Regions:
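Cell-envelope and extracellular/periplasmic
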Residues: 23-341
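Bacterial Sec-dependent N-terminal signal peptides
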Residues: 1-26
Length: 341
């Protein structure tokens, strides 16, 4: 491929400009992706606003429910963090809030924010199943067309964590906060939506749903390496076989496979650890089928995962609600029926 002199000069100018822009560091001013317009923030607990900026930069955070201006400086790694007090939600009051984050001349504004209860919803396909039909075995909610048509609940918001696999804990994750409406409701987790709707109707406070789930995933995939390594039985059962396998030497990509979704730690690293600075009212867990052969150790595994999450979120009393996987065709004389739950 041949370039004219003018094209080469233009290319060199663009590269030089891009390099100087990167060295200046202004482009790295950012806030965590979980902090967005349309979000619900947890009532009665500090809101942690965090992100990155050029090392040593002053970052200013203002919110419209507190008169104080909050300031901090990014550390040597470019990380910064500020805690903002959050009041309790008032039932029936849905005043929308704003947050402004600035560094130098750069200002980021978050709007249409509500204060309420935020729930972390995780597990496998039982939790991931949307209100609308998706796959032959994920048929959606009963009367899903009527449910979607009536899903006009702007005080219910959803952040669906983008499914991903990581060998090491990630700083951030993908996803977008959306407001519940007939347009967006089809993509809501059915279980999370009906749970949120019932709580909202009873309590009249906004409900945020952070759904972090992947079909077919195992409990060990949602548990940290340290947690599995520090328990001799869990290490022997899950971590050691994986660490000595061919799969552990592969570079992990984002392609979903049945083999990959049961690997230890990968969803914790990509889809739980990035949420570490959020506060939650509690967690909903609907999983179990992919651990159906691990009945002798599953209780121990779940207990350690819960302990792991509570430590991560700095909340030793964080409520954790299980949905027991229901027996499937239990009345039939089929000793394999439990596999189809």
């Amino acid at each position: 491929m041949k370039f004219h002199k003018s094209q080469l000069l233009t290319l060199l100018f663009v590269l030089q400009f891009s390099f100087s822009f990167a060295v200046d560091g202004t482009q790295i001013f950012s806030i965590a992706n979980t902090l967005q317009s349309n979000m619900v923030i947890q009532q009665g607990k500090p809101l942690n606003v965090w992100g990155t900026a050029k090392s040593g930069s002053q970052v200013i955070v203002r919110v419209d429910w507190v008169s104080k201006i909050f300031q901090t400086k990014s550390d040597k790694d470019g990380k910064w963090s500020v805690d903002i007090p959050v009041p309790n939600a008032i039932p029936g009051e849905f005043n929308k809030k704003k947050i402004w984050i600035s560094q130098g001349k750069q200002i980021k504004e978050l709007s249409n924010i509500l204060i309420g209860d935020v729930w972390l919803c995780s597990g496998q396909s039982n939790m991931a199943m949307e209100i609308k039909p998706w796959l032959p075995w994920l048929l959606g909610a009963n009367s899903y067309r009527i449910e979607i048509e009536n899903a006009n609940y702007p005080e219910i918001r959803l952040f669906k964590v983008r499914a991903d696999f990581k060998a090491m804990p990630e700083e951030d994750c993908g996803g977008t906060w959306v407001v519940c409406s007939p347009k967006t409701a089809p993509n809501f987790s059915a279980l999370a939506y009906f749970f949120a709707r019932q709580i909202f109707i009873k309590r009249k406070i906004p409900i945020g749903l952070v759904v972090s789930s992947v079909g077919g995933s195992s409990c060990q995939a949602w548990t940290s390496r340290e947690t599995l390594a520090n328990d001799s039985q869990l290490y022997k059962k899950y971590l050691f076989p994986y660490d000595t396998s061919r799969q552990s030497k592969e570079q992990i990509d984002s392609v979903v496979t049945f083999e990959k979704v049961v690997r230890p730690t990968i969803f914790y690293n990509a889809m739980i650890y990035p949420l570490r600075n959020l506060h939650f009212t509690g967690s909903l867990w609907y999983q179990g089928e992919s651990n159906r052969y691990d009945s002798s150790i599953y209780t121990q595994l779940c207990a350690k995962m819960i302990y792991n999450w509570r430590n991560l979120f700095r909340d030793p009393q964080l409520p954790f609600y299980f949905v027991q996987v229901a027996p499937y065709n239990w009345f039939q004389n089929d000793d394999k029926a439990y596999e189809y739950a």
